[in-house]
Design a protein with these regions (language model features):
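A conserved acidic beta->alpha catalytic loop
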Residues: 28, 35, 43-53, 70
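Short alpha-helix within the catalytic core of nucleotide-sugar-dependent glycosyltransferases
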Residues: 23-27, 51-55, 87, 100-112, ...
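Catalytic core of nucleotide-sugar-dependent glycosyltransferases
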Residues: 209-215, 221-252, 261-264, 270-288
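Short aromatic/hydrophobic "clamp" motif used to bind/position activated sugar donors
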Residues: 90
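Membrane-interface aromatic/basic loop that binds lipid-linked glycans or pyrophosphate carriers
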Residues: 270-328
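Glycine-rich, basic loop-to-helix element that forms the pyrophosphate-binding segment
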Residues: 69-85, 95, 106
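Donor-binding/catalytic cores of nucleotide-activated saccharide
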Residues: 74, 95-202, 213, 217-223
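N-proximal low-complexity "stem/linker" segments adjacent to membrane-targeting elements
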Residues: 1-31
Length: 328
C-alpha cells in the first residue's frame, strides 16, 4: 500500500568503489512504502565497476539519476548531490548501508505531523559477524539546548545519532547556506550544530530502520593522524559555538572528549600535522579557561582534564606509563 505524497525526498547516495554493496543499498530505497523519492547517485571517481553499475541502475529505475565526478571525498560528493536535489527533503544514505521498507515513510510522517525541519531516526548496527543491535531515542521534539544536553549525557552507542548526517530527514532549505566541509574527515561533526541551530523543530523518531553496516573500511577503523586532527578541529569548533551560546557546561564536557582525542595523536607525526596539533592544543587550552567552573573540579574527569591543562606532557607520560603496565 503506497503512502500519501507528503513531499519529494531526495535520497543522496555517494558512491566510491562500492560495486559489492551499491545495488542492495539502492534497491532498499526502491522498496520503500513511501514512493515519492528521487535517488541521486554520486559516483565520486570510482576506480572499480561502480560507474558502470550506477549507469545500469539508473537505466533500470527511472527515479534514479547518476552524477559522475572526479574524486573529491565524501563531503564533495554529498555537496554535489545537494546541488542537484529537487526534493523538499534531503536524506543521506551511505552506499554500504541500507534501509528498511518503512524508514522514509516513518520519517516524513513524523516531519509532517510535528512540523519538524529535522527528523532523527534510530539505526540498527550490523557487525562484521552479522549480529544486529538496534539503537533509538524515544519519540519527541527537543530544543537545541536539550538536544546537546542529551548528546553530552548519552554514554551509549546511540550518541552516534546526534552527530551523523545519515539516517536523518532534513528540510532542503536548511542547506541553502550550509555545505559539508570539503577535504575534511568527520565531515558531519563540522556542520551538525549549524543545522540543529537553524532548525525550527527537531524531532526524534524511534524507528530503527537504517541499517548501519560496520566494517573495516570505515573512517573510524582507519584513523590517520590527519583524520584525528580533523576530529579535534570539529570538536573545538563546536565547543566554541557552545561558549557563544553561554553553554559553558556543555563546552567543558566536549573539551573532556577533545582531551582524549588529543591524547590519541602520537608523537611520530609529520611536521604539518605537528603544527596543527600544537595550534589545536593552544586553542583547547584557551577554550578550557573560558569554560571551566568551580563545580568542574568536583568531578573526576574534570580534575583529570585540569591536570592535563596544567601539565600536558606529564599527563601524557603518566598515561602512557600506566597503559604500558596494563592500567587503563
Amino acid at each position: 500500500m503506497s503512502c500519501p505524497d507528503l513531499g519529494l525526498i531526495s535520497v543522496i547516495i555517494p558512491a566510491y568503489n562500492v560495486e559489492a554493496t551499491l545495488l542492495k543499498c539502492v534497491e532498499s530505497v526502491i522498496r520503500q512504502t513511501y514512493q515519492h523519492t528521487e535517488i541521486i547517485l554520486v559516483d565520486d571517481g570510482s576506480l572499480d565497476g561502480t560507474p558502470d553499475l550506477c549507469d545500469e541502475i539508473a537505466s533500470r529505475y527511472p527515479s534514479c539519476m547518476v552524477i559522475h565526478r572526479e574524486n573529491g571525498g565524501l563531503s564533495a560528493a554529498r555537496n554535489t548531490g545537494i546541488d542537484h536535489a529537487s526534493g523538499q527533503y534531503l536524506y543521506f544514505l551511505d552506499s554500504d548501508d541500507y534501509i528498511g521498507d518503512i524508514e522514509l515513510s516513518s520519517l516524513v510522517h513524523a516531519a509532517n505531523d510535528n512540523r519538524a525541519d529535522i527528523v532523527i531516526g534510530g539505526f540498527t548496527k550490523i557487525s562484521e559477524s552479522n549480529v544486529s543491535e538496534a539503537y533509538a531515542i524515544p519519540d519527541g521534539s527537543v530544543s537545541e539546548l536539550n538536544y546537546w544536553q542529551r548528546a553530552s549525557h548519552d554514554k551509549t552507542y546511540s550518541r552516534t545519532e546526534y552527530i551523523v548526517s545519515w539516517g536523518k530527514l532534513f528540510k532542503r532549505q536548511l542547506f541553502n547556506s550550509i555545505r559539508f566541509d570539503e577535504g575534511k574527515i568527520h565531515e558531519d561533526e563540522f556542520i551538525i550544530h549549524k543545522l540543529i541551530a537553524d532548525a525550527q523543530n527537531v524531532y526524534f523518531c524511534s524507528v530503527s530502520e537504517y541499517y548501519y553496516v560496520s566494517n573495516d573500511k570505515s573512517i573510524m577503523s582507519n584513523e590517520t593522524p590527519s583524520s584525528k586532527l580533523d576530529g579535534i578541529e570539529a570538536y573545538l569548533c563546536r565547543s566554541n559555538y557552545f561558549l557563544t551560546r553561554q553553554w559553558s557546561d556543555l563546552a567543558f564536557d566536549l573539551l573532556i572528549q577533545t582531551k582524549q582525542l588529543l591524547l590519541g595523536v602520537n608523537d611520530d607525526i609529520g611536521d604539518e600535522d605537528r603544527t596543527r596539533f600544537s595550534s589545536y592544543l593552544r586553542e583547547w587550552r584557551s577554550l578550557y579557561k573560558r569554560s571551566v567552573s568551580f563545580s568542574c573540579l568536583f568531578r573526576i574527569d574534570g580534575l583529570s582534564t585540569t591536570f592535563y591543562y596544567l601539565f600536558p606532557m606529564t599527563y601524557r607520560f603518566l598515561k602512557e606509563l600506566l597503559e604500558t603496565n596494563g592500567v587503563e
